[in-house]
Structure formats: C-alpha cells, structure tokens
Amino acid sequence: MSILSKKLNKLDHTIPIYSPRTTYKNIRQNDEHLLADLTLNFDPFTINVLKNEFGIRDMQMKLSEFILVVKEHLLSWQVDIPNRETKLVRCLTNLFEEIDLNGNGILEWDEFTNYVIEKATVLNNIKTKVDEIKTYTKSQVKPLQAQTKHLTHKFNNLVTKILYIPHIDRLALYEEGSAEILFMNPETGVMNNKTLKVVPKSLFVTSSTVKKDEEGLIHVETKKNFIDLKTMILDILYIPDKKYQVLLTSSNDKYVRGWKHSSNGWVLASQPDNEEELIEHEFKNEIYCLAWDSLNEILYCGQKNGNIVIWYFKTDTEKELEREGAHTEVIMDMITMPKLQFLASGALDGLLILWDTINNKKKRVYKEHTRGITSLSFNEALILLFSAGFDHEVCVWNPYIDNLIYKISGHSSPLLGVKVIEGTSQVITLDSDGNVRVTDIKKFSNVQCFSVETSDEKHKFNPQCFTYIPKPLKLAFCGRSVQLYEYDKNYNPNYVDDYVAICCAFVPSQLAFYTPAGNKIKLWNALTGDIKKIFSDVTQGEITCFTLDSLKKRMLIGDSMGQIGIYNTYNGAMIKALPKHSAEIIQIIHADAITMFISAAMDNKINMTLDNDFGENELIRTLELKDVMITSLGFDPITKMIIVATNTGITSFYESDTGKQNGSFSELTQYEEITSLNLIKNLPYIITTTTNGKINFIALPPLLFKFQKVFYFKNEDSEQKLLEQQKIQKEGEQQLQQQQTQQINIGSAKGSILNNMGQGKRKQDDQVQQNLSISNCIYCDQTKCLFLSDDKGFIKCFDISQILTILEKSYNNHKDKSNNGAKSFLIPPNFDGVEYQEVWSQRAHYEMIKSLEYIQEENLLITTAYDKKVKLWDSKTGNLIDQLQQNYDKQEPRPIAFKRSGTEEIYDTNLEERIDLKRKSSLKNAKLLVKNEQKGSQTAIKSLSLTDKKLNTQESSTQEQEAAQQPQQNKNEGVQGQGDDLFANFNPNKTYDEEFNPFYFMDKIDKTKLKTDRSNSDWKLHINYIKYFESFEDSIKQLNIDIQKQEHELREKTEKQGINNRRFKVNPYQNSDLNAQKFGVDHKPILKDEINFKQENQDQHKVKADNRIQEGLNQVTNSQATLPRIASLQNNKLKLQNQQQQVQNQQTEPSSNRSHQQPGIETKTLAAISGDQNKKQKKVWDNLYKKELQSKFLFGSNQSEIRLSKEEVDAAHRLAAALANYDKDDYRSLKFYNIQIKESKGPKKLQPLSQSKKK
C-alpha cells in the first residue's frame, strides 16, 4: 500500500484553497497591487524617455506599442516574481485601459501625463474601510454602585489610571493613594463587588518586657506580634498573553505582583511552568512604570531615579540597563517594540531613549522635547513612534531614523496621554484641560476635537489618564470620575453609510458597485460584497448627483454647492471641472452623440459644455427656465433634442443645436410633477411618470401628432388593494358565522354576504383612484419591461410588450410612403383591447426609495432609500438577493480545502482526509489490487497496470500543460544542448494556470468530499464573473501573440540593420565591416577574436545561446535560484555525461570538420579545477573577479587556458544571465555562457571524468 501517501503532519506547510469566486477576487486584487507598484516606477527620467518614444509615434500609441515600449524601461521591476512577463502584460493592459478614458484604443501623450498628475493628487484621498475615521460622541454610561445599580458611584479621590482587561471585559482603575483596584463594566457602568486589594506581607515583630515579682526576681517576657502594613499602587499593567493573562501591580513597598482572575475574585498568580512559584518580585527601589515584552517574556520596570530594571519571568532574575547617559529623572512611560527589538522610554528629563533589547544598550537618544515626556505610543503597521509631553506637542518618530518626522500641535495645555488605536489610522491625545484631539496618522490632519467635562459644574473633571476599548470602539477617560465616549454612535451594520446613498452604479470593468453618500464614494466588490476602497473628500459640498459616462470610465459628480466635476472611476482623481451653477445640481447627462455634457440645477439653468477631454471648459450655451423647477432631464440621440421635465407637469423639448424650444406637453392636472423620463429605443416615443401615479407615452417628431399623449396607465396601490380584499373576506366570514349561530336561513345569509362584497368592491374601486406617486422608473429594451418604485417603498415590474407592439406597428405604417399609411400617419394608434400586465410587486423599503438602477446583463435591480440601505433584487422574480452592509465585523473568506506545499495533495478543512482526484484514483487502484491479489489473477494485474499507465499518461499530460509557459529548448540542440543547460531543472513557483485560473484547484478536487464549495457564504449575489474572466484572458492571450509577433519582427529588423534597438549600439558580430572598426558606438573596445568570426558561424552560435540564456534567465528569476542549488543541479550525473561527451567530440573531431573556423580564433580550453566545498558563496563571486575573468573576456585576452572551479563556473553562468537581463543580445553574455567544466591532469591535456573517478 505504498501508493497511499502519509498522513498530513501539523508541521507541514499548507496553502489555503478558496472557491473560484474568491480566488478570482484575489487574482484581480493582486493585479491591482502590482499595478500600483508598477506606477511608482514612473519617475521623471522614465517619463522623459517615454515622451521621446511618444514623439517618434506622433504622440500616441496603440496598446501593443505601449506594452512594447514600457517593457523596455521596466527591466528591474519585480524580477523575482513567477510568470513575470504575463503579469507585466496584464498590468500594462490594465494601465492602458485606466488611462484611455475616451476609449478610442489609442493612448495620447496628454492622457498619459494627466494620469500621472492625477495619481499623485489622489493618494491621500483613496482609503480603505479601516482608514475611514468617524466621530466620537459622549456615552450615557456612568459609574454605578454595585448594590443599587441606579445610584452613581462616587470616588473619594482622583482616579489615577484606567486600563481595559479584555479577558473579563472590565475596566480596571484605582484612585490616588489607594491600594485597591476597582472594576467597572464598560457596557452598563456597574462597579463590581469584588475588588483587588494589594496587601503587603505583615511585619513580624518580637517584643520583650521585663517584670519584677514579689520576691524580687526579674522575669523577661517575649511576645511575637504581626503588624499589618499599608501600601499604595503606583502602576498597573495587564499581560494579555494566553500563557499568563495576569494583572501586574507595582506598589510603594517595592514589590511587583501578578494577579489572576478566578471565580473567587483576584488571587496571586503563579508561574505557568511552576505553580508553586508566585509571580512576585521585590526590587531595590520603587517601580513607577511597567512595560511588557511578550516575545521574550520580559518585564521592563522604570524607577524614580531614571533607571530601568529588567525582570526575566522565566528565571525570576533582574538586570539593570546601562546608566551612563540614561535618564536622570522619573520614567513616566515605556513601550516595547518586540518585532523591531527596541524599547522606548520617556522621562521627565525630556529625553526619549531608544534601547536595543538584544544587547540592552542605547540605540538612539531623541532630544526634541523641551520639557518632560509623559506618554508614548507606537503604530506597528506604519512603524511610527509617538511621544507626548508637557511642551504641548506630540513628536512623531521612526525608530530607524535619527531625525524628527513630524510634530502634531494644537493643544494649549500639557499633554497627559497619547494612544494609537490599533488597526486604524487614529491617534488620540489628551491634555490637562480635558481637550481631546483625534488625528489621522496617514494625513496628519485633525479629524475631531472635543472636551471631556463633568455634569457637575462646580467641579472640574481633572483628567489623569485614558484608554480605549477595541470592540465596540470606545474611549474611557478617568479623573474625578469616569467618562466613556462611543465611536460612530449612529453606526448600524446594516446601513451602507451614515448618509443616504443617492444611487448605486455598477462598473463592469471594476466589478464594483459605487455608492456616493455625503462627500465620499464607496466602492464595493461585487464578488464578495466587501468595501474595496473609499474616495474621500471628493467634493466640498454634499454629493447630490452622480452618473457615469457612456464608457463607464468617468464619474460625473455634482454637489449641493453647484460644483460639477469629472472624475476617474479607477482612482477617483478629478480630471476637470465643468462650469459652476449657483444652486444644487439636479442631473448631469453625457450626450455622446453630440460630445457634450448637459447639466441642470436648482437655479433652473441648463448648461451645455463640450466634452473636450483634458482641454479647457467650453460652455456652448445656457438654457434658462422661468417660473418652473426642473425635476428631470433627458436627451434623444436620434432627434438630438434636450427633454426637460418640470414640477408643473410640463415636459419641454429643446433643440440642442440652437437651444430653441421645439414643443411641449402639459398634464391636465396642474402641478402634477414629472418624476422621470425614459426613451424607447428605435421608436419616437418617451415614457414619463408623475407624482399622481401616471405612466404616460408621449409622441416625438417626426410623428405629426408629436408632443401628445397616446396612452397611459396608473400605478395602483397594491397594498391598499390587498388590504381591502382581506377586509372584505374577513367581514364576510364574520357575518356568516353570526348568521349560522343564530340559525338564520343560509340563503339569506349568502345574499347579504354577496351584497356586502359588492359594496366592498365599490369601495375598493374608490380607493384605486388614489394612485401611488412614482419616484423612479426604468425601461428595458430587451425584455420590454418597465420597472418603477413608488413612495410607499414598493418596486414593480410591468410587461408593456403589447403597448410597444402597437406603437411599433403604427410607426412602421408612418414610415410607409404609400397611400395606405397616409391616414394612419395623422392619427395616433388605437389601443383598444391592449392590456399591460403587472409581473411582480415587492415591498423593497419602508421608507421612500431614493433611486432605482437596472443592470440588464446581470438581471439585477438596485434600490437605495432614505433608510440608508442599498438592496439588490432579481429583476425576473422580484426576490431579494442581498444588500450592501458596512459591517465592520464581517468574517473573512474561509478556505474550502488545503494543499500540502510542494505536493499535489489536497486535504479537507480539518486536514484529516485527502480529497484530490489523484487520491481517489489511487484508492480505486489500491482496492482493485487487493481484490486481484485475493483472486490471484494475472490478467487483472495486467488490467491494473494498464489503468496505471492511463493515470500516468493523464498526469504527464497535465504536467505538460502546466509547463507550457516555460521556455522551450531549441529542437536543433538535441540532448546535448539540454545537458549543457545549467537551468534545465528549474521550475517556477506557480504555473500560469495555478496563478491565473480560478478553477485550477477545483478541477483537481473530488467535489463530493467538499463540505462547502463557497468561501463567502454570507454574500448571496452571483455575478457572472466567468464572462469577465474569459473575456479578459482571451484578450491577454491574443495580445501576447501580437506582442511576440511584433518583437520577432523588430528583432529581425534590428539584426538586419546591425543595431540593438534597446541601447542603439553596434554589435561587433553583426557588422559586415568589422575589420574597419576598433571601437563600437558605446566607446567600448571590440573583442579581438570576435573580429574574425564568420557570419554563418556567429549566427548559428547566437541563436542557440539566445535560447539558452533566455530560458535560464526566466527560470532563475521565477524560481529564485541560489548558487548552492545551481551547484547541486550541475552535479547531476546526466549533465556531466553530456558535458564529457561534448569534450570528447571536440577532441576527436578531425581538422577537416573544423576547417570552417576562422584562423584568427583559438579554441579556448577552460579547465575546471575542483574547489574547496567549504568556501562561502561570497568568495565564489570574489574569486571570479580576482581572476579577472570578466576583463579577460571583455577585452580579448589571448590566454589559452583559464582554470575555474565548479562554483566559479556557476557564478559565470549567473553573470551571463545578468548580462542577458541587461541586454539580451550582448555579446559578453554569449562568451560567459559558453564556459564549460573540464578536469585535467596537465595544462592542456584533457581526461574523461569517468577515468579520473576510477583512479
């Protein structure tokens, strides 16, 4: 049963496998990260070079040209990642699409430079969900007595310090001069009955008394007494490590004690490894400050005299840090940085000292503070250290830098504390006056300021300290009392934002939903429902209008201040601003047919601005309406008319060329507001909706009955209708029961019931007349359906196909120039017998719906409402799919399986059972083998062997497909060429399919063994991502083919011209007139032995070397090869045999066969001398240069023999690969790559390796 693999060890490294949807999300996210890193390479020098490249091509490039050009200037970008070439092409393709905003497939220089400028201006405005900082508000929670739970707990003295203990979810605090620690519930404010009282050991005293008895004898009496001592707490610290979970206290009796929480309260804790030994230590001096190093299990204790003592928990020993040049006054705060192996200490002497925890010596001393330091804090993610003191300022440091980075100012009183909220970009500071400032670390900008005050005006709060509670995030301040401040008090996990989202747009290229709310835009991943990024502070005012251009590459945004801007959908950068209105923006339209932007505002003005990419704003004309208010705006691309709807029920039509009014339609009811406009494709009609619940069909030119209503129907109150029906049915049933109990004639009872039902029906008909106001309406051309939302929060779907059929038939008759259509040309169509059908109706929200969006490709409806929710609906059935939620505690995607690293074995989530298909086949074959052994049948064994052969064939074919992306050996080289290739056995870390195919692992898993095939079961929306994935992959594959073809053509062209296109230098072996040149255009001497090369020999040699160098280079960079690994590969027996055969062939080859060589070239014999195996890798490279190997080949030395060890030859191959990376056609790389390993007994005589081994 050797065919079965061993059980997975817990120490084995495993790789999580996610569902295809989550995997595809990770692939796209990785592409975005690589693209962000790639754009950092656009420094001024690179941009200047690219400008010259653009200039050669008339300042514009196509996609393939852009990739070819930029690739040449990104040779040092991410050279060690697998599948680098493919990733580079993917990134450059995404970059091209991101820059090409007009979608013409051509990248202009203006587009490129504008993108670079945009990228620099929006870095601070792009945030993640964690970066977004909300505000703090005062909580109603206050300290309450434990007995009554409604009376306020009063403290006798100031509360000196407060900290949060997550293990028991309590706030620990103590009063000034007290030896007792109190515990408070942060949710209710109730103080615990059980407290922690620090009681020192009693003092043992022996007293003697002398007495004289009656007889005159003297007696001495001895008594033993215990005196109870009192102490006060100086500092407290909680160790959250699971191994300890101990509360430490330092007191003025020079003791530091550890306390453990139990069911009986707090007791002295013992060492985890020795229960008999208590966590208690007596120091020589009082400890005023404590800091814990969780990595090394060390406690740093700061003393009053400025000394720092180290207490090693494991050995219960102590050690002092060096005193020379250290603190001279009491240490106020210390903070450990275990990952950086630093300790920071701040004291009242104003010094901030950074200690090296490895040798316990000073690393740096910062002297920026002019007065004493009171508090320290550290942000591990950004590697920033913060120090606050009595000089009113917070200094920001980087532990690796000697100088100050930044100063946070704004306080007017001495600072008492500074805290970094872990996992966020917030820094909280508190001063002695109770002023609190919230600062954004990444922008160093003030976010919020508030003051901590007490309800009692007679007494000040006198703040002393503060801490924070992580979940839910709260700030706890202590002074005369305890006050709590809640973060994002109005936070609701089901909301999309604190503000109402005015709409929700879908961008297919990003697979993201855009929800503008307030002055920011949130981007939601359509694959997982998570927030991808946030465009913050987009506008000065609140966003009131949001729409996308025709290509969905630009955002058109208007705000409450009348400002309009065009922004990039990829990065949120502002491209340009449109002419400003004097009031709130209502709607913006991108009229692509006339290349204009049309905007309407509350000032009753309509601006028409030319869409001229990055040029200046060109306002074409302005239309001003009087005595009305614009409610909706539309544009007909066929007639090129601007359609304006107003609050008075008038729909006006204006010519876009002249601005003149062409006609209008008015509702019969005055002030019947028009709420929406919808055009019908290929038909001269529009659909309008009103606040009275009417859906109107209005004719447009060229119809002679233009600007007239040809048909309408009403939006009935479905809820009211249903209630009336239920009411009638209920009343009928009640009357029937009453009549049955009174034994009344059944016939008369039925008659009365029918009579009442008829009355109810008439009442219902009266109710129908009160139609619901329509807030939004969208028409779908393909499904012939009309989707609308009303004021009651309902969304409905109407099938209007019969109405459209009549309109289409009538319009076709109008286009008929015969006499038969002349009569119908003048008369509106007849709708007798035409019915519209309500397909479905659904209660979407319990408040008014703000917007309604329809995504036809995904059969998706999106609603936003004033309840701050965004919901996704199935447009076919009206069922709720999911909703966007700002849930901070949302679970991360869970793996569906695990893969053992370095193998093809795949295990379930419990790491107990293999679930890969290969395992399934192995088990099947193993069972068949056992069965055949029992039967003793040889034929069955043969069939098993055939099955194994098929399995091996499938595995080999799979491996061939996975290796398809690796560089292929030249077929002309044969076996000998493969043996010479030093990098033949290198494999990339990941194959192409493994890295870019989201279904790669799913195709290898036995799906019947999976517990679940979804990594994110919380997200119910199923976007058809396969369509986007296949489309992008097909374009990349075709693009790779085009690029390879162009590179081949370019290579042939440069070879014919003898010019290297990359550095524009002449290669000596490509110049026909070599004898006339002594130096190349790069001012480097030409090799002497290269001058006499024949062209035919050089060409053949170059093709072989090119292929081997490129393959070796790609495989080295993909597998991150090291010299030891190369040496082990070169010691392969097969390679040595091939090299031996090649040497023998060269020795035994007759002179006639070598007559084609030029007489000026001597065949160099490079004998390899076995080197010392214990040499370091660094010496190999040093040896290479010490022997001047490089200079000998570069400048054409005539030395006939150079002796090299195997490690040095390996280094030479690496140098060849590096030279090829610099320049693929560099002749120097050809020379280095041809170095071969040979062993010799004499200076020139070569001996086969096999014979030397025998000796």
UniProtKB/Swiss-Prot annotation:
Biased composition, class Low complexity, residue ranges: 953-969
EF-hand domain segment(s): 87-122
Transmembrane annotation, as ranges: none
Gene3D superfamilies: YVTN repeat-like/Quinoprotein amine dehydrogenase
Start and end residues of each stretch annotated as Disordered: 941-988, 1140-1160
Chief localization: other
GO molecular function ontology, one term from the record: calcium ion binding
Entry keyword set: Cell projection, Coiled coil, Repeat, WD repeat
GO CC annotation: cilium
Biased composition (Polar residues): 1148-1160
Entry keyword Coiled coil: yes
WD repeats: 228-269, 282-322, 326-365, 368-407, 410-449, 496-536, 538-577, 580-624, 625-664, 669-708, 769-808, 844-883
Signal peptide region: none
Record PROSITE patterns: EF_HAND_1, EF_HAND_2, WD_REPEATS_1, WD_REPEATS_2, WD_REPEATS_REGION
Pfam short name (any one): WD40
SMART domains attached to this UniProt entry: WD40
Residues holding Ca(2+): 100, 102, 104, 111
Cellular compartments annotated: Cell projection, Cilium
Assembly and interaction partners: Associates with components of the nexin-dynein regulatory complex (N-DRC) and the CFAP184:CFAP263 complex.
Family, per entry: Belongs to the CFAP337 family.
Function: Associates with components of the nexin-dynein regulatory complex (N-DRC), a key regulator of ciliary/flagellar motility, and might act as an inner dynein arm (IDA) hub or linkage.
Name of the protein this chain belongs to: Cilia- and flagella-associated protein 337 B
